[in-house]
């Protein structure tokens, strides 16, 4: 999640520790190493060079929190936990529709990263823009009502948005939905209209952000499972439930989604750098899936920690 959403950033990140480990990235094992088999399906990154990669809406370097979270800094945290590949998510608050830094990361490390980018559905030919970004490693697109101040209720009905969904059915680029529980019925309708479009719902549709796991919200999320190309990111633990490790209160929700979608349509993700703020940390996030949930088989864990994200995002 990012600064567009009203979630409190409780504390600044421990950037010094991140920077210390980043120097080891250049000598790290290959992405397909047995030591780093897992995929983090959702992390943001940004550089401190705001002159080279300008921020939107008049923001300056002082607005970055943390001041730097580069791909090297991310991998310095991820690799010790067995994560060798990451799906990088465009930060709508800092760079919005300018995907340049993420594209640069893929250019430098084409085997390690894929991108969920953003295009402006209010501009002409967003479908053409999507197709142009596919060879650059952009295999999904973040769509969200939170960037729209006008026509918020109709965000899925705009012609450009409909074009994006149609294009995704052609290219396999996923529509990655950053939404609230109240947005689930609208997304469900779009899945009905575009049954061949891959759809990923981020962060459990933010169920539990207020500490409550409402049955009606979970029913609406599980209802989406009837569309065969939908999958769920089980992610952003820092923002849900008790919002602190060991995150065990999320297990009943994960089990319910496991029963509705099956392991082949669930994927773990950290939502860094926000998962490493305050009392939260990267290890606690991946450990919930890797080490703690007893109803998962070894093969299930392969899907949640690697195969689903590989299938959805690393196809090109």
PLM regions with names:
Residues 2-27, 32-39, 51, 57-60, ...:
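Mid-to-C-terminal alpha-helical segments outside catalytic/metal-binding sites
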Residues 38-48, 201:
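Histidine-centered catalytic micro-motifs
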Residues 42, 102, 168, 232, ...:
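Conserved, mostly hydrophobic/aromatic
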Residues 43-45, 206, 274:
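Short, glycine/acidic-enriched loop or turn micro-motifs at the edges of active sites
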Residues 49-54, 100, 128-129, 212-214, ...:
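Short aromatic-enriched loop/helix-cap "lid" or pocket-rim segments at secondary-structure transitions
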Residues 85, 94-182, 189-191, 231-237, ...:
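Active-site gating/metal-coordination segments in enzymes
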Residues 96-109, 195, 200-201, 253, ...:
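Short, electropositive alpha-helical surface patch
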Residues 154-268:
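Catalytic pocket-lining loop regions of alpha/beta-barrel enzymes
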